[in-house]
Amino acid sequence: MSETNERNRRHVYQGRVVSDKMDKTITVVVDTYKNHPVYNKRFRYSKKYYAQDENNEAKVGDTVRIMETRPLSRKKRFRLVKIVKKSV
């Protein structure tokens, strides 16, 4: 399998930065929606991810895109790809 196909299969999520207090690390909340299997009510499900921010450029409130990568630390498995929208 070629290198480009491997890289394209990685998960890419878009979420909101809720913490930037760590050096070169941001905490991103990703909101997704699920349907309840019995009642078919749609509800919001959120999950926090740690992401590598090499230049410390993302701030709290920014909307960012993160991509799955090799394990960078015990909890960090994502890296910052792009800041989609800056906070006010």
From Swiss-Prot:
A Pfam entry, by short name: Ribosomal_S17
Keywords from the UniProt entry: Ribonucleoprotein, Ribosomal protein, RNA-binding, rRNA-binding
Molecular functions (GO terms): rRNA binding; structural constituent of ribosome
Keyword Ribosomal protein set for record: yes
PANTHER family found in the cross-reference section: 40S RIBOSOMAL PROTEIN S11 FAMILY MEMBER, SMALL RIBOSOMAL SUBUNIT PROTEIN US17M
Function summary: One of the primary rRNA binding proteins, it binds specifically to the 5'-end of 16S ribosomal RNA.
Subunit note: Part of the 30S ribosomal subunit.
Record-given protein name: Small ribosomal subunit protein uS17
Organism: Lactobacillus acidophilus (strain ATCC 700396 / NCK56 / N2 / NCFM)
Gene name of this polypeptide: rpsQ
